[in-house]
Design a protein with these regions (language model features):
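Short beta-strand-to-loop capping motifs
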Residues: 20, 117-121, 165
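Short, flexible turn/loop "capping" segments at secondary-structure junctions
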Residues: 43, 60, 107-109, 154-158
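Conserved PLP-binding catalytic core of the aspartate aminotransferase-like
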Residues: 84, 88, 99-147, 152-153
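PLP-dependent enzyme catalytic core of the Aspartate aminotransferase-like
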Residues: 133-134, 138, 147-189
């Protein structure tokens, strides 16, 4: 199993891991600089050093460890409950704006804090830019590396705007996001 540290584990970008069975014979893709056997002519063959090319990202791994500690201390259920609550708040507010639809449905769906919206007649890039420029709200606009999904949804020409919520967001921030979305959509029509 491979995982990235910056999605849901609150670690920095560039962190992650690989969980394998102890006896799996796996060869590294890239070899290089070993801090444990500096004068050996060959790269270490024992795990995990065999898969570590170059300097270990110690600062990043410390950040990942802090993120995992936060999850353990806060609790997965508490984090999930808050994210679900504020995500539902946003979905309900967004759907009250004429021409805005939540892609993938909403209401009662157990999912992450990621909400993609389609705004009838509004290019997603223009909306994303307006939210950033006028409101300081960072979203992701476009095709999200999924052009076939957008073709199936009928949004391949304008894309979608994706909002991402975490347990660190507040209900006040979500309310501001709804106001910003409504005003930005109205300004772009």
């Amino acid at each position: 199993v491979c995982f990235t540290g910056h999605k849901s584990l609150f670690g920095p970008q560039g962190t992650g891991g690989l969980c394998i069975v102890p006896d799996l014979d796996i060869a590294p893709l890239v070899e290089g600089g070993s801090g444990t056997h500096t004068f050996d002519e060959r790269h270490p063959r024992f795990m995990p050093e065999a898969l570590e090319a170059g300097t270990v990202n110690a600062h990043g791994l410390a950040g990942l460890a802090a993120g995992v500690r936060f999850i353990e201390e806060t609790g997965v259920d508490a984090i999930h409950e808050k994210v679900s609550r504020i995500t539902s708040q946003f979905e309900e507010g967004a759907c009250d704006i004429g021409g805005v639809s939540v892609l993938g449905g909403h209401g009662g769906i157990d999912r992450s804090g990621v909400v993609a919206i389609d705004v009838e007649g509004v290019d997603s890039s223009l909306l994303g830019d307006a939210l950033a420029r006028d409101w300081g709200i960072c979203t992701r606009a476009g095709a999200h590396c999924a052009p076939l999904m957008h073709r199936a949804l009928g949004t391949e020409q304008r894309g979608a705007v994706r909002f991402s919520f975490s347990c660190f967001n507040t209900e006040e921030e979500v309310a501001k996001g709804i106001v910003a979305l409504k005003e930005s959509v109205n300004a772009l029509r």
